[in-house]
């Protein structure tokens, strides 16, 4: 990937689902810091300190799975329910005339956006 970047065939390098140890190793052992890291992120999995770490390194974070994992096949024997059924989200939604799904989406869409200075 670093070679592609130097040829101009790509504009940036991004990663997905790396742990902090993997990210630290990547930053220490490569010549290019990733521009973006895609992580699972929702009210049950906010990863605030990891997101702050990325910010300190100049790495933009994007999130996927804003409603948590809705697929029961991945869950253990313990039933944890669905994020969109979370009573706290429903209560906040009721206060603002929004669904719990809209509240969950709003949690991450209200974060500050890092703006780049290149226009592609």
Give the label of every model feature segment.
Residues 1-120:
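Beta/alpha (TIM)-barrel catalytic core signal, keyed to glycine-rich beta->alpha loops juxtaposed to Asp/Glu
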